[in-house]
From Swiss-Prot:
This protein's name: Probable insulin-like peptide alpha-type 3
Signal peptide: 1-18
Database matches in InterPro entries: Nem_insulin-like_b-type
Family designation: Belongs to the insulin family.
Pfam families, per database record: Ins_beta (PF03488)
Organism whose genome encodes this protein: Caenorhabditis elegans
Cystine pairs: 28-58, 40-71, 46-72
Annotated GO MF terms: hormone activity
Length: 76
């Protein structure tokens, strides 16, 4: 039971990190493209033309789930 609790806490920590301000600041600037490519592997990212601009991405503080919704055609 203890091992299951540890695994669950690790998973939740990773999910929480994807939405934290520190994570968003870390992927601001030129790291945005790398982050989008990491979130949308194997598909042309943002092919619907809704790629967030670096200024918008950083000022709005998009979480990874919001970027997936905007940019990954298979996640919708």
């Amino acid at each position: 039971m203890f091992v299951l609790l540890i695994i669950l806490s690790i998973i939740l920590a990773q999910v929480t990190d994807a939405h934290s301000e520190l994570h968003v600041r870390r992927v601001c600037g030129t790291a945005i493209i790398k982050n989008i490519m990491r979130l949308c592997p194997g598909v042309p990212a943002c092919e619907n033309g809704e790629v967030p601009s670096p200024t918008e991405y950083c000022s709005m503080g998009y979480s990874d789930s919001q970027v997936k919704y905007l940019c990954c055609p298979t996640s919708q």
